[in-house]
Amino acid sequence: MRKFTLLMLLLIVISMSGIAGAAEVKNLNTSKTFTKIQEAIDDPSTTDGNIIIVGPGNYTENILVNKSLTLKSNGSAIINAVSSEKSTITIKANNVWIEGFIIIGGKNGIYMENVTGCTITNNTIQNAFVSGWEYYGGNGICLVNSTNNTITNNIIRNNTWNGINVCESKGNIIKNNTIMYSGGIGIYVWGFNKFEGNNIIENNRIINATYGGIYLFRPSNNKICRNYIANVSSGGGGMSGAICIDVSDYNIVKDNIGINCDGGLFTDGMIGNEITNNIFKNCKVAVSESTYGPASRNNKIYGNYFINYETAISDPKGELVDNIWNTTEGGNYWSNYTGNNTGDGTGNIPYYYDNKPLVVDLAIEDIAAKPSGIEVRVKNLGKADIKKIDPLTKLKIKISCDNDVYETFIDPLSAGESQIVRWDKIVPEGNHTIKAEIPYSAEGYLIGTNIRDADISNNVFSKIVQGFVQNKTFTITLTNLGKSTITIKYYISIYTNPVNGTKVSYRELTITLKPNETKTIELGKYPFKYAVSGTMIVKNPSRYRIPLNLRIKYEIEGLNPQMREISKYIAPRGEFRYIARYTGKEEGYADVW
């Protein structure tokens, strides 16, 4: 009985394990289900255009897709190659769609040969392995003689050789992929002979590759745009860079970023390429030309930013001279360049082959005293964009006036961009000298940065300005100190000065104050030397005399107020009339008379 019970428990456990680990593959068009992906593909009723949904689970198989199918998973289907001699997925049909898988191992993660119109999207592809060098092995994705395919939004990592290997394939779109830890190259486009590529490679992130970020070997007319490449080493061979163009012609290489690589731009025998608006930062060698192949010539290389390099240009044979390094507007930015601004935003002496190096030239353009404070206009007169050099840097600005000093920081400025620095110091009436400066080191570097200012003569600017008569708030506050309610008629005029000024305002007010009640009359904002003239009338309508106990406070914003108190009786059916004027004094108080 005990043995029978144990046997039943074992069968239940095995049954439950099978249910928990079961994976379902379903053809949505035929409604058939399978336990293997290859079974679903090979089924005779599976035809071109069918959609196969692969449920969560582990699938240990090498898959051959030889029909125009869509294979989709929600990101939880893991395909492990059963044989490392074959690719995990091999595509031999056109118009195949692969989406949402975790693809592990195999000779390649995905291998595509002689196909067109396929889409590989939203997959994680990792650990493709070969033990030695192979043309078509050890890659996350490998395309051979394939056209017009789309590879997007994949994570490709830890492969023996290349993240994406594109051999003699044309018109493909490779974008928005993240490629990490490639033993070879991040994206390698190559051929045994020169060929028309017309591939688009854009918005990819390539991190930690051994022999190059994006490497073009013999294809032409490709677009390499807006890619981010970091941490590319040379693998000991010396022929490496964030972007490598090797015997490859008429490509557009634009708006890419290469950071922390052994090389920024590697060239060899390239012709007619446009290499513009790229940023190469913290690379040991900014630009290097191979010593093995033919000379690179007739390439446009300008508008690029080469920042914090050890060697600007490595060109032992002088083969990079026959290229276009600048237009009439300017060339490239070189962080180690020490020339000065010629007045047009470029350097006054060439830098290697670049005759018009882009420079930074911060200048104090103007100083103004405004009613709200001091304004200083700072402008980058250079043609180098500081936002590209260091988007996180802060530029120090120092302003002084009347022994007061104000220091602040502004964000980086693009070429030709201005920024207003505001200091809320109110400049009083009269002449005052305001000095503004952009601090720099003895070598001409902007303080707190690694950015050299190419013209320090305009970093300091002094100007004598006329201060403003500041408008102040005038108020009168009335407090009834007596025990009876009183009514006050108040006639108030405001003049431009207390002697013979022009009347600028007139008001008639009726104010009722209960015992111990306080009310404030706000007269408006005027220069503190304006004068307020007020006539106050309090009437007694009764047959008896009444006491009047009133406190009056005269105030001008920022000055010491003055108080007056009235304590007297008003005759029966009589009235009390009180006339007073007040103005502001330079000494800082309100004067009442």
Swiss-Prot record:
Keywords: Cell wall, Cell wall biogenesis/degradation, Glycoprotein, S-layer, Secreted, Signal. SMART domains: CASH (SM00722), PbH1 (SM00710). N-glycosylated; contains glycans composed of methyl-Man, Man and GalNAc residues in a molar ratio of 2:3:1. GO terms for biological process: cell wall organization. GO terms for cellular component: extracellular region; S-layer. Gene3D superfamilies: Single-stranded right-handed beta-helix, Pectin lyase-like (2.160.20.10). The S-layer is a paracrystalline mono-layered assembly of proteins which coat the surface of the cell. This is Cell surface glycoprotein. It comes from Methanothermus fervidus (strain ATCC 43054 / DSM 2088 / JCM 10308 / V24 S). The gene is slgA.
